[in-house]
A protein has these predicted regions:
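Formylglycine-dependent sulfatase
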Residues: 1-261
Length: 261
């Protein structure tokens, strides 16, 4: 059985499968055929500790990831990483997009340390930070190309990591978001600035959803959907007060949607 692990940054549960008014129709359609975990919580409200806990099955104080990987924190034992474990047990392991368990996202040495046999990740040099949703799209295209030629005789673990919905958000509000009707989540003040900020988040979520839908469509077109466990999740809450970096429900409550054939 193949495993497709799709993960986002800073999305919390602010997506349509969880009742949020977010333009994430592809994810909502997928959720209708999957298990939607409504009480999923991450092990830490910051990026690297949360991801390291999920991918090692151990708490941050056990695995050593007590802060952000790009600031010098790391796992005590990288052999505990899921990609390492699966690679030792017959899986071809593939990384496309971000990882946050070793160094910075595009650390050239990190994929091998984490246990990935193959790296598909595009260069991000041509993109400004607020344009990284386009980088996510380029990586989605690379995932799709890889799925077209995947070896049917060799199970794979493919990690597709998106920068979305991390700040800074796209500057232009997409057509799928009508800023006139956007409201920031409680307890954020409702004013012109916060409504615009929320519209930018929803725009980021829209682009994330388009990339998610593209990958799932190719998985199906390649005849692999019924041979693949698909896991969608995020690391922690949205980058807002009382959310990300906070031990509140909105800080550690995460989206977790899994489809098992």
């Amino acid at each position: 059985m193949n495993i497709l692990y799709i993960h986002t940054h800073d999305s919390g549960r602010m997506l349509s499968p969880y009742g949020a008014a977010a333009p994430t129709d592809n994810l909502l359609a997928f959720a209708k055929e999957a298990a939607v975990f409504t009480q999923a919580y991450c092990a830490g409200p910051t990026c690297s500790p949360s991801r390291a806990a999920l991918l090692t099955g151990t708490y941050p104080h056990q695995n050593g990831m007590l802060g952000l990987a790009q600031r010098g924190l790391g796992l005590n034992d990288y052999q505990r990483h899921l990609a390492q474990f699966l690679g030792r047990n017959g899986y071809h392991t593939v990384l496309c997009g971000i990882q946050h368990e070793s160094g910075w996202y595009l650390d050239g040495e990190a994929p091998g340390k984490l246990g990935y046999h193959e790296v598909l990740t595009a260069s991000a040099d041509a993109y400004k930070k607020e344009e990284l949703h386009r980088w996510d799209g380029e990586n989605a295209d690379r995932v799709c190309q890889w799925l077209k030629q995947a070896n049917p005789e060799e199970p794979f673990f493919l990690s597709y990591g998106m920068h979305s919905t991390h700040r800074p958000y796209p500057l232009e509000i997409c057509e799928a978001v009508d800023e006139r009707y956007v409201r920031p989540p409680f307890p954020i003040d409702d004013n012109e600035e916060t409504r615009h900020d929320q519209a930018q988040f929803l725009t980021s979520a829209y682009y994330m959803d388009q990339n998610f839908g593209k990958v799932i469509a190719q998985l199906k077109a390649s005849g692999l959907l019924e041979k693949t466990i698909v896991l969608f999740t995020t690391d922690h809450g949205v980058a807002l007060p009382f959310n990300k970096c906070n031990l509140t429900d909105s800080g550690i409550g995460v989206s977790l949607i899994m489809r098992v054939p």
